[in-house]
Amino acid sequence: MTHIISNKPLTIEKVNEIILNDKKLELSKESEAAIIKCRRFLDSKMGDIGRPVYGVTTGFGSLCNITIPAEDLSQLQHNLVMSHACGTGETVRPEIVKLMLLLKIQSLSYGYSGVQLATVQRLIDMFNNDILPVVYQQGSLGASGDLAPLAHLSLPLIGMGEVTYKGEIRAAAEVWKEMGWEAITLQSKEGLALLNGTQFMSAHAVWSLIQAERLSDWADKIGAMSLEAYDGRIEPFYPQVHEVRAHKGQIDTAANIRKILEGSEIIKQKKVHVQDPYSFRCMPQVHGASKDAIAYVKGVIETEINSATDNPTVFPDEDLIISAGNFHGQPIALPMDMLSLAMSELANISERRIYKLISGQRGLPHFLVAKPGLNSGFMIPQYTAASIVSQSKGLCMPASADSIPSSQGQEDHVSMGANAATKLVRVVENTERVLAIELFNAAQALEFRRPLKSSWTIEKIFAKYRK
């Protein structure tokens, strides 16, 4: 199966489909033409440009006022990629590196970057053959693009760096030899086009959004099972309540939980308690707020992954080469910090439901075992959940609240969006672990409601989980 790279907007769903189905990439004829046209325009300007063009005929960052001789322009780009590959820390997981490749290819395909067609094609070759550069998590300020990680992504193009291929980390030069590929000789601006961009941040955001939508759905299902196990009330989920406070996420969550619990004997039985704790009763408001946040962030990220984010931007039709700031990560740094909060809150409220289920209330035994004392039962899973939730709260300190000037003050405001991106992944993973612990507790607690049955949906989840 093949996905054609074109001007047709990518959606999060389409990206997920490409990755899950291991689709190959191919440039549309229109994209090929746009890339070639932009490169030819840039080449035509090299002889009579008449003025310095940042990163094309000059140095980089605070070295922007140093003019580079024409005979050194290719070496300039080669040196840029080498000098900026200064990442450190843990390596980025292969599935996110593959997303980085896809998003970089998409961004370059619009024909505003001035790269050679051969450069984009080699990136496609790498994607299609699962030859994934070794990229490190630390090093990007999220402005001037994701310089260090994108340098590591680009090193293999020039026959340098390391790649993961067939489960092994190997020198790119060795793999290139096996594949019969030649190293790319970068032309003017190409190194900058490869390094200036937000694909490190965007790839982490896309991965996190895919998981966030899945976990948001599971939070409703697991929360509904906990509500049943706790012998909770259905009235707080009635549509009338939410019509008078019409946040979409809230309305959708209430409707979802009503549907999940449809046909339950437990929810229909007479209740002796007047109301439930907030962690049960306010699921529509809390889960719903996270749904709304996910939807907002999704819209922003979909705009970003369909954008040209390098600098300078080349406009052949307008006869313009403009040095500007589309590399700056602020537009996605703020939403990624927001998504961390949204996912952390799903874990936060989940942990509170876990706590209630083991508290010996509403006919449930202490710690969900028949002989508490002799057995500690489900005591410690709640400790684990509390520890994870506490960690996520710390990770929710907004990375985008910080900025440290760099490059001798030329780059005097940065987004720190890459830090927002990497900690977002950790928060998402933490949330999944906490929801898994809640499911563990809810399934055990549900046993104590027998012989009453829950809904068909809950019983199906229960049976599959217990199996």
Cite the ranges covered by each PLM segment:
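Cysteine-centered functional microenvironments
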Residues: 135-140, 317-321
